[in-house]
């Protein structure tokens, strides 16, 4: 019985013979169709072929009655993907290929091929209904992706363009409780990454912008939501293309890789270049070294119940060739993945961070590119939740936000490394020791978590920074390392007793455990250096923004000034009320008749600012009302009030109306004349006393500068408050924080704390920021 009769009896189309001839002679009937081998196979060929490791996961279907195979030469009308490719209409018995009507007309309509015998396939009603259902499903999927649009997620400066989780979910256009995975793509610029995503996920729609121009059309990181596969698709900027902020853009790629569940590395080259393996190897090393720890910290900090970094993402290397064979074609016994691992080992790169690495290649004889194999591989990996499970969009945003906050900031040009795609300098702190030049080994922005700078190497001494630290020798011998500093007095001494002891026996070194271990003038002669007797010296690193370590903490002079100032201020505050009352009464007694009495002036007549007890009230010489200093700072002659031709203080309103002559009656002029002489005498006395006070203030300022501790910022350099940025004036006094030495206003430095590290063992003025620091200052 012939093979044709056997097939007809089974209800199959005639001509469905094995197309592989791997274990048979090609005369056995076809039982299976392998979509990835693109052939019909008999029982023996199917078993022998798919016993190989690289072919083991191919999708095969068993042929049913009335089965019609796909057309062999084409991938469907207009080169569409296999999801909508054409079924064959005939089979050429001479060429032994299946042809659709279009391919038959194109290839067998002329020449000798016209005479080739053909067998017509009969399409059953069952097959027609199945194809109709497939087309309906395909149409539904296309319709689901019609409204998808991409949006800029992160710009080229590493700044996230989404404000919060709600904004991220709104732009993705997905449900807040939707569980999804993240698929991102990487590759060199111009290799068609955006084009690949458009055809793999969105049926060729230009969701991600593509351009035939030389300039890259993808700048930054763009994202879109695929409702069919329920994944967030991320398009990235190409490698080897950026010329500005290259280091920051490269670092941005690793942030995207860290939040991805599946990574596609797209390469359009006849052979796999070393750049691919170096990129993946360096990315793996940087991921394990810097990002795994941060992702775990984010999980704990945000209270997430999803492990973000159990294993890194899976990687698919999508390799498109034109003139060369695909990887592994000349070694059928070896899987392409094994050959890729060998390449990694030869280059000394070990991609341990990735959960798996897969190879998917396609050879494009004639455009367009076939993305069907890539799509099938992606769908298989997306269904696998063993290592990476889907998660809420909010979790994805939190992870990206945490990585962006942690690893941000400019990367200096001198720290750019060309031997690695992701050098440590992209992710570690950029601070350098001012003394030895060693770099900090901690991650970027570690100061926000209260972690101090650290270096791998020891520092060297620099006289400029005096980077020595004293530690108690006795405590060190007992296994403890306790830092000590020279200071004016012991913590057990009262402020005045400490000053007296300092004048007699000099500065002290006090250990919290051992007490006072050294006094500089304890004996009349023969006092030894503390380094030779009671302390050890260590050389430490000097980081930008920190002070030197053994600056002069002898603040005896400043303590004396603070004490005198405190007593003077106390007396002044106690006598402020009576003094002001007496002054106001005397002023009213000698004031002209048209002046409003001080007791009736509660606020400025122009700006309505209420006067405090110690505020000065000024009278306008023209109208006699009470004003603050800023509303009565102008001067002009007021001869109509008897002040003569000399300019005197007037308010802003009277100054603006200086061309209008006041109508003063003769009786008023006589009354004012009597009291005006007394007021002029009073002002002359007041101005004389003010000049004396100013003359005293100048040497007093010199005394303050001389008594100022070394770490205090000089008064003449302090122009505004270090915290609130208010400019200092006559009314706004400057105050030094005893911890950091910066200048502050009273509101920003009204707290009091002991600062032992600066020699202040009793509560003294500290700024708002220093007061928030935990532990001893």
UniProtKB/Swiss-Prot annotation:
GO terms for molecular function: 1-phosphatidylinositol binding; phosphatidylinositol-3,4,5-trisphosphate binding; phosphatidylinositol-3,4-bisphosphate binding; phosphatidylinositol-3-phosphate binding; zinc ion binding. SMART domains: FYVE. It is found in: Golgi apparatus; Golgi apparatus, Golgi stack; Endoplasmic reticulum; Preautophagosomal structure. One of its GO terms (cellular component) is lipid droplet. Its main location: Golgi. Pfam families: ANCHR-like_BBOX, FYVE. Ubiquitous. PROSITE patterns: ZF_FYVE (PS50178). Zn(2+) 4 binds at residues 737, 740, 767, 770. Keywords: Endoplasmic reticulum, Golgi apparatus, Lipid droplet, Metal-binding, Mitochondrion, Repeat, Zinc, Zinc-finger. Residues 416-777 are annotated as: Required for localization in the lipid droplets. One of its GO terms (biological process) is cellular response to starvation. Zn(2+) 3 binds at residues 721, 724, 745, 748. Zn(2+) 1 binds at residues 604, 607, 628, 631. A zinc finger (FYVE-type) spans 598-659, 715-775. Plays a role in the formation of lipid droplets (LDs) which are storage organelles at the center of lipid and energy homeostasis. Regulates the morphology, size and distribution of LDs. Mediates the formation of endoplasmic reticulum-lipid droplets (ER-LD) contact sites by forming a complex with RAB18 and ZW10. Binds to phosphatidylinositol 3-phosphate (PtdIns3P) through FYVE-type zinc finger. Interacts with RAB18 (in GTP-bound form). Interacts with BSCL2 in a RAB18-dependent manner. Interacts with ZW10. This is Zinc finger FYVE domain-containing protein 1. It comes from Mus musculus (Mouse).
